[in-house]
Amino acid sequence: MGRNKEFDTALVLHRAIEVFGEYGYEGTSLQDLLSHLGIARQSLYDTYGTKRDLFLSAVKSYLEGKNAAVMERLEAPGSVKEAIRDIFQEGVNALRDPERAKACYIINSAIEQIPHDPELARYFERQSKQLEDAFYHGLLRAKDQGELNGEDTDISALARYLNQSRLSLTFIAKVTADMDRLQDHVDVSLSVLD
């Protein structure tokens, strides 16, 4: 008969997101994980498998949570343009907060691994497409509501652009401490909606 887990798996995943976000996948040792997660080596292996398995679980937990929030916001009643602005602004606010930013940086760690990990690459592609589709459907609604100018607006290209611009926020925040530059990126990115 197996033993019951004596730790909160959701909390452990949250901590793993922060550790991998702060140190990167390659820079995170097993000892770093054990120390930050507060669990025994065998518990880590029994619950998550290898370091890579834990990393994939952490990335998936982070992305699925963030993507669900974005999709929910895009599907909510009201102004789609305002929803998109809120989504981008929430990204900036998260990156301005050092504690919340740690979690965001797991995306950079994952992107570093994509060339070496086809499973992770396919997962990112699916998640990115899911968000792009959410932006697309939101933009269609915005067009129907009269929020977008121009009959010939390429909704597909605009959805792809917004998705990629949003994803680039973590990279920009990682390479500069100047949050005004991050806000400039958001303002210019969203100017296509005007």
Curated annotation (Swiss-Prot):
Q: Which GO terms describe its molecular function?
A: DNA-binding transcription factor activity; transcription cis-regulatory region binding
Q: From which domain of life does this come?
A: Bacteria
**Keyword flag Iron:** no
Q: What is this protein called?
A: Uncharacterized HTH-type transcriptional regulator YezE
Q: Does the entry annotate any disulfide bonds, and if so which pairs?
A: none
Q: What species is given as this protein's source?
A: Bacillus subtilis (strain 168)
Pfam families xrefs:
TetR_N
GO BP: any one term: regulation of DNA-templated transcription
Domain named HTH tetR-type: which ranges?
A: 6-66
Record keyword ATP-binding present: no
Q: Encoded by which gene?
A: yezE
Residues in the DNA-binding region annotation: 29-48
Q: Which UniProt keywords apply?
A: DNA-binding, Repressor, Transcription, Transcription regulation
